C-alpha cells in the first residue's frame, strides 16, 4: 500500500492539472505559433514558468485505484497487476480469465 500522503499528492496534482489546463494550452499555443512576435512569445514563456510546477500533466503518475501502487499499472483497468490478478481469480472482471493453452 502506498502512503496516504502519496495518494493525496497525486490527487492534488490531478486537481491542479484540471484547473490550469486551459491556461497552459493557450500559452503553449502562443509559444508554438510562428506568427506571434518575439515579445509575445517571451511573455508567454514567462507566464508558463510562473504556473505551479504540479499543474503540468507530465508530473502525474498513474496509480492503482485500490492500493496506490505506482508500478505495474494497467490503464485499461485502473489497477496494478497484482490487484488485477486477484480480481480476475475471484471472477470480478468480466471477460477476463487466466490464460490456458
From Swiss-Prot:
Pfam families: Ribosomal_S14 (PF00253). GO terms for cellular component: cytoplasm; small ribosomal subunit. InterPro entries: Ribosomal_uS14, Ribosomal_uS14_bac/plastid, Ribosomal_uS14_CS. GO terms for molecular function: rRNA binding; structural constituent of ribosome. Binds 16S rRNA, required for the assembly of 30S particles and may also be responsible for determining the conformation of the 16S rRNA at the A site. Belongs to the universal ribosomal protein uS14 family. This is Small ribosomal subunit protein uS14.
Amino acid at each position: 500500500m502506498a502512503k496516504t500522503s502519496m495518494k493525496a499528492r497525486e490527487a492534488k496534482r490531478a486537481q491542479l492539472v484540471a484547473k490550469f489546463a486551459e491556461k497552459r494550452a493557450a500559452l503553449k499555443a502562443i509559444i508554438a505559433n510562428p506568427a506571434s512576435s518575439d515579445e509575445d512569445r517571451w511573455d508567454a514563456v514567462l507566464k508558463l514558468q510562473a504556473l505551479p510546477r504540479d499543474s503540468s500533466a507530465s508530473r502525474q503518475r498513474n496509480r492503482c485505484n485500490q492500493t496506490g501502487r505506482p508500478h505495474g499499472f494497467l490503464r485499461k483497468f485502473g489497477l496494478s497487476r497484482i490487484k488485477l490478478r486477484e480480481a480476475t481469480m475471484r471472477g470480478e472482471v468480466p471477460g477476463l480469465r487466466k490464460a490456458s493453452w
